[in-house]
């Protein structure tokens, strides 16, 4: 008798995706972050659902409802901090996942890569709207500053901003619609993740060597299921340590003050995972230029397949590009630090230099290094 998992219409799909999936035998722990992102999404949807049961999206009661969740709801504090810090874990996994894709040349799977970029934008939009919901000072002013950037769009900008706000400022209408979008988007992310996997399974996974691994495949279960579970346990350990010992370490103290349109905080800044993009935005003195740089800082990923000049796929055997990759990582950490600093000397110039370096490495230096390495290896 054939196994039910191979014949049943629904189980068959799961079997081909997670059980009998042929997987390269040499993929390292950097390949764990896809499944970790899946776990993060499940945690966020589960905790978010329970938070939504007690939250009210009204400017007069939003802040109080979050306080009520933390004080009066059974384990409400746990759910709230798991959700807030779960977002940080989500972005840590996202950045590593994208970094792995760049390092090992996974962007050559163009469809998978492009869906991934759409996923990144969607997750960023969801996180931004979620940050507005507690209706603290940084929620309100963050929403005001970031939505206001759209007014830089010529001709339709101002109309567009007021349309998003649902009025002439960030107010009740804005909060209500942000809550609605924040609730629906994670389900769209889940659907996109399925499409992401669908395209990945058309080609099969990449591997650290960048070579074709068809000759050496192993079943996903039990080898990689057990490996993924180990990764999940380690991530849960990190998340729960954060939640139980230092839940506010990544948050902004200003968000414990209820939103007040009459009082601007001295330093308006987004959550830590947006600081690199915020630093790039601020490094250009022109509003429209800054907005374009902000969008391009992420959209530049879509150019990766076109900018690939080397005959070799990954960076495993390419020391020059390897060095550039790690300089890029250091540069992004520098930008993250600058994004959290006030706009004054020397931070302005450091931010501008780091922004120039960011675009130069991706657009000019890495493609050049690829050509040089091919010449050295006599591949061209």
Curated annotation (Swiss-Prot):
Binding site for heme b b562: 83, 182
Residues holding heme b b566: 97, 196
Cofactor note: Binds 2 heme b groups non-covalently.
Protein's UniProt keywords contain Electron transport: yes
BP-aspect Gene Ontology terms: mitochondrial electron transport, ubiquinol to cytochrome c
Keyword annotations from UniProtKB, A to Z: Electron transport, Heme, Iron, Membrane, Metal-binding, Mitochondrion, Mitochondrion inner membrane, Respiratory chain, Transmembrane, Transmembrane helix, Transport, Ubiquinone
Record's keyword annotation contains Cytoplasm: no
Topological relation to the membrane, as annotated: Multi-pass membrane protein
Chain segments annotated as transmembrane: 33-53, 77-98, 113-133, 178-198, 226-246, 288-308, 320-340, 347-367
Sections of the chain in a coiled coil: none
InterPro entries associated with the record: Cyt_b/b6_C, Cyt_b/b6_C_sf, Cyt_b/b6_N, Cytb/b6-like_sf, Cytochrome_b, Cytochrome_b_C_euk/bac, Cytochrome_b_N_euk/bac, Di-haem_cyt_TM
Sites where the protein binds a ubiquinone: 201
Domain of life: Eukaryota
GO cellular component, one term: respiratory chain complex III
PROSITE patterns associated with the record: CYTB_CTER, CYTB_NTER
Cofactor: heme b
Pfam families: Cytochrom_B_C (PF00032), Cytochrome_B (PF00033)
UniProt-recorded Gene Ontology molecular function terms: metal ion binding; ubiquinol-cytochrome-c reductase activity
Location of the protein in the cell: Mitochondrion inner membrane
Function: Component of the ubiquinol-cytochrome c reductase complex (complex III or cytochrome b-c1 complex) that is part of the mitochondrial respiratory chain. The b-c1 complex mediates electron transfer from ubiquinol to cytochrome c. Contributes to the generation of a proton gradient across the mitochondrial membrane that is then used for ATP synthesis.
Other remarks on this protein: Heme 1 (or BL or b562) is low-potential and absorbs at about 562 nm, and heme 2 (or BH or b566) is high-potential and absorbs at about 566 nm.
Subunit record text: The cytochrome bc1 complex contains 11 subunits: 3 respiratory subunits (MT-CYB, CYC1 and UQCRFS1), 2 core proteins (UQCRC1 and UQCRC2) and 6 low-molecular weight proteins (UQCRH/QCR6, UQCRB/QCR7, UQCRQ/QCR8, UQCR10/QCR9, UQCR11/QCR10 and a cleavage product of UQCRFS1). This cytochrome bc1 complex then forms a dimer.
Family note: Belongs to the cytochrome b family.
Name of the protein described by the UniProt record: Cytochrome b
Organism name: Gymnuromys roberti (Voalavoanala)
Lineage, opening ranks: Eukaryota, Metazoa, Chordata, Craniata, Vertebrata
Name of the encoding gene: MT-CYB
């Amino acid at each position: 008798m054939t196994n039910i998992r191979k014949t049943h219409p629904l189980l068959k799909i799961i079997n081909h995706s997670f059980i009998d999936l042929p997987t390269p035998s040499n993929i390292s722990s950097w390949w764990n972050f896809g499944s970790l992102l899946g776990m993060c999404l499940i945690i966020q949807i589960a905790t978010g659902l329970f938070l939504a049961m007690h939250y009210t999206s009204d400017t007069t009661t939003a802040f109080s409802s979050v306080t009520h969740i933390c004080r009066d709801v059974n384990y409400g504090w746990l759910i709230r901090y798991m959700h807030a810090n779960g977002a940080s874990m989500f972005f840590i996994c996202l950045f590593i996942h994208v970094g792995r894709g760049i390092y090992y040349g996974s962007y050559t799977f163009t469809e998978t890569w492009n869906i991934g970029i759409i996923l990144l934008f969607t997750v960023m939009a969801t996180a931004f709207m979620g940050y507005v919901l507690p209706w603290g000072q940084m929620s309100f002013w963050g929403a005001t500053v970031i939505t206001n950037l759209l007014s830089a769009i010529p001709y339709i900008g101002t109309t567009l901003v007021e349309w998003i706000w649902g009025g002439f400022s960030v107010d009740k209408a804005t909060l209500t619609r942000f809550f609605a979008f924040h609730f629906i988007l994670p389900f769209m992310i889940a659907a996109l993740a399925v499409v992401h996997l669908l395209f990945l399974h058309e080609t099969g996974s990449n591997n650290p060597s960048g070579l074709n691994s068809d000759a050496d495949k192993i079943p996903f279960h039990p080898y990689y299921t057990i490996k993924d579970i180990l990764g999940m346990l380690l991530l849960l350990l990190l998340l729960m340590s954060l939640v139980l010992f230092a839940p506010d370490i990544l948050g902004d103290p200003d968000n414990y003050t209820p939103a007040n349109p009459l009082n601007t905080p001295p330093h308006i800044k987004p959550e830590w995972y947006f600081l690199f993009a915020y630093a790039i935005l601020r490094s250009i003195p022109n509003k429209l230029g800054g907005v374009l740089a902000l969008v391009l800082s992420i959209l530049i990923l879509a150019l990766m397949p076109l900018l690939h000049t080397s005959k070799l796929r990954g960076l495993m055997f390419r020391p020059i590009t390897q060095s550039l990759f790690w300089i890029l990582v250091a540069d992004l950490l520098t930008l993250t630090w600058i994004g959290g600093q006030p706009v004054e000397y020397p931070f302005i110039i450091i931010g501008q230099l780091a922004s120039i370096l960011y675009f130069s490495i991706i657009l000019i230096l890495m493609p050049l290094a690829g050509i040089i390495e091919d010449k050295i290896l006599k591949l061209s």
